[in-house]
């Protein structure tokens, strides 16, 4: 389970890496369950999507070859502040939300569409991208846990697949929250070394940069195709110096 990750810094990286404005308020360097972090989603709008009309073909132009339809406009992304640890929409109270969200910082891609905690959020296509510089795992090969930082080899920010939710209580309280989607890493050349032996190895579903918009807009059945283990040779592991 990924319960600790490092936020993007400096904040000037947000526009180039994710095509969103930098956060208005500082984000903690290290994120843990129930701490406020940020995520990126498709901009929410109550307006109907514009209908793109096909380009007319003049009578003088040859009509032997069909013209390609105009490309659909890319979704506008927005950066949102939320709690790390998802609060399901059916939670009854703030106190219950606090208890449950601590355990809901990760969602397994294999069961996300059937889990009582995440099913509604997944089917509503409330997908997001969680920006980070690195995530942390324990190296237990020596017999004691050694916190280890996992980052991209090139040092650039990572965009991890996630889900977001906005819970509203009976008294009007609201909590915006998010969770990280994870995939199996038993056979992963790097991540297979870490975490507890004899248990299933997991890792966050790091997205390819070119698939961000497609991930945010895909149909739920199609969205599963984006949830894959990130190549080991694109990642770098370093023990955390105390």
Task: Name these PLM-found stretches.
Residues 1-242:
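Short linear sequence motif anchored by a di-proline
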């Amino acid at each position: 389970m990924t319960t600790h990750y490092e936020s993007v810094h400096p904040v000037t990286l947000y526009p180039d890496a994710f095509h969103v404005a930098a956060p208005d308020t500082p984000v903690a360097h290290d994120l843990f369950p129930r701490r406020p972090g940020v995520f990126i989603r498709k901009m929410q709008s109550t307006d109907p999507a514009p209908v793109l009309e096909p380009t007319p073909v003049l009578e003088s132009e040859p009509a032997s070859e069909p013209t390609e339809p105009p490309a659909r406009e890319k979704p506008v992304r927005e950066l949102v502040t939320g709690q790390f640890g998802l609060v399901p929409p059916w939670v009854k109270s703030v106190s219950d939300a606090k208890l449950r969200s601590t355990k809901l910082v990760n969602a397994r891609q294999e069961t996300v569409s059937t889990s009582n905690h995440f099913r509604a959020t997944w089917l509503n296509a409330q997908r997001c991208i969680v920006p980070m510089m690195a995530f942390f795992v324990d190296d237990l090969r020596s017999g004691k846990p050694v916190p280890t930082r996992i980052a991209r080899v090139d040092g650039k920010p990572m965009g991890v697949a996630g889900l977001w939710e906005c819970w509203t209580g009976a008294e009007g309280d609201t909590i915006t929250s998010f969770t990280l989607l994870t995939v199996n890493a038993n056979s992963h050349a790097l991540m297979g070394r870490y975490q507890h032996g004899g248990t299933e190895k997991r890792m966050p579903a790091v997205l390819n940069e070119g698939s961000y918009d497609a991930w945010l807009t895909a149909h739920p059945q199609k969205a599963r195709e984006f949830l894959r283990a990130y190549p080991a040779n694109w990642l770098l592991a370093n023990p955390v110096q105390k």
